[in-house]
């Protein structure tokens, strides 16, 4: 979750995602078709742009403009759940999408939705962060494959997942390298479901596009 809608402006290139758009060809060499669930966040467009640069095709739906049956009808190879204001309970289809067996990548609010879908608690973060660069450590798997052990990322959130309440089916994959550690990433032990609390599409996350590419590769491998 971002602190509020205004805080998520990603710079001059940001614009609202086109919620009703059909499949648009991507510029990448991958065949995967990726749906982006837009949680009414200005960062969603940046995610769509990143996905479009590496995937075979991309489309966008607002979180209240499609249900699980509609997503299945679209038949994407993977789904990205965007950041946004509010809580997972207020984010439409964003939590239900994790009932799918196909790859799903949750970003910020999407990450919290993944955790909430498995019974995790989402509460107030140790501090409210708005465009804060942080260093994280990670497990070098999933979206972190092939990346340095320590990464700089951009954080925009007032809520976070409570580590003590993570169920056994979720593995913590990243955390802040600070005195008050915050869960920065999780993955499901069996399903190809991944989440990150930070914003890979932010200018404050230099390796963010590689993370999106890694997710598209997960989609390719799952086909």
What is each residue range found by the language model?
Residues 57-60, 122, 172:
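Generic structural signal for residues in well-ordered beta-strands
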Residues 59-65, 86-88, 134-137, 153-156, ...:
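Short gly/ser/thr-rich secondary-structure transition/capping motifs
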Residues 103-105, 121, 152, 171, ...:
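Proline-centered loop/turn at the N-terminus of a beta-strand
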Residues 108, 157, 199:
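Histidine-centered divalent metal-coordination motifs
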Residues 140-190:
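Catalytic beta-strand/loop cores that center a nucleophilic Ser/Cys/Thr
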Residues 177-223:
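A glycine-centered loop/beta-turn motif at secondary-structure junctions
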């Amino acid at each position: 979750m971002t602190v509020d809608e205004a805080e998520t402006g990603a710079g001059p290139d940001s614009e609202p995602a086109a919620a009703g758009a059909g499949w648009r060809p991507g510029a990448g060499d991958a065949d995967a078709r990726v749906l982006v669930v837009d949680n009414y966040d200005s960062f969603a467009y940046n995610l769509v742009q990143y996905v479009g640069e590496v995937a075979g095709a991309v489309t966008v739906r607002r979180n209240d403009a499609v249900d699980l049956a509609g997503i299945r009808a679209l038949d994407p190879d993977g789904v990205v759940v965007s950041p946004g204001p509010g809580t997972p309970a207020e984010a439409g289809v964003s939590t239900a999408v994790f009932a799918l067996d196909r790859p799903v990548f949750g970003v910020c609010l999407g990450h919290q939705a993944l955790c909430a879908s498995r019974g995790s608690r989402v509460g107030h973060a140790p501090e409210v962060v708005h465009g804060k660069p942080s260093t994280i450590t990670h497990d070098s798997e999933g979206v972190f494959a092939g990346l340095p052990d320590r990464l700089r990322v951009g954080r925009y959130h007032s809520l976070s997942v409570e580590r003590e309440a993570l169920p056994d089916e979720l593995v913590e994959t990243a955390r802040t390298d600070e005195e008050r550690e915050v869960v920065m990433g999780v993955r499901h032990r069996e399903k190809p479901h991944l989440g990150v609390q930070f914003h890979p599409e932010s200018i404050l996350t230099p390796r963010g596009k590689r993370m999106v590419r890694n997710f598209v590769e997960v989609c390719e491998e799952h086909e």
